[in-house]
Design a protein with these regions (language model features):
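Short S/T/G/P-enriched beta-strand
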Residues: 1-26, 100-109
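Beta-strand-rich structural segments
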Residues: 19-39
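Solvent-exposed strand-loop boundary residues in beta-sheet-rich modules
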Residues: 34, 57-59, 96-98
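Short, surface-exposed alpha-helix to beta-strand junction/turn motifs within ectodomains of secreted
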Residues: 37-62
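Short, acidic Ser/Thr/Gly-rich low-complexity loop/linker segments typical of extracellular
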Residues: 62-72
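Short strand-edge motifs at loop-to-beta-strand transitions and within beta-strands
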Residues: 73-77
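Surface-exposed, short loops/turns at beta-strand junctions within beta-sandwich domains
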Residues: 78-87
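Enriched for extracellular/lumenal, surface-exposed ectodomains of secreted and cell-surface proteins
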Residues: 90-103
Length: 109
């Protein structure tokens, strides 16, 4: 068997920034390490099935009710109501990406 290693691709590391955090929603902007400060390469096209939300404080899964991407790479994530000061963890899975930094970056309600 012959393999051309020049055809192999590594995973793109992804970071997250959270904003508009509330008891039922938050926005997540997802960027790779590529591009520039003014024109970063964003992670686009994710759907609800790519994401899971977990309440670290209560040790319980949180139901995501809807996800909308607008603008590109920024996701409005709506979920079942959570208690103020609870800590949430967003986990994303998508081929070609490494979301370890996103998972480590928790969200405080």
């Amino acid at each position: 068997m012959s393999t051309d290693i020049s055809l192999l691709n590594g995973l793109l590391d992804v970071t997250s920034t959270y904003s508009s955090i509330g008891q039922t929603s938050f926005k997540a902007t997802l960027k790779t390490q590529y591009g520039s400060f003014l024109n970063p390469v964003l992670v686009e096209g994710l759907v609800a099935g790519d994401m899971a939300l977990y309440n670290v404080t209560d040790s319980a899964s949180v139901t995501i009710t809807s996800i909308a991407e607008s603008p590109d790479g920024t996701y409005q994530i709506n979920f079942a109501s959570q208690t103020v000061a609870d800590v949430l963890r967003l986990t994303i899975t998508k081929d070609g990406y490494n979301f370890a930094a996103v998972t480590a970056n928790t969200i405080t309600i």
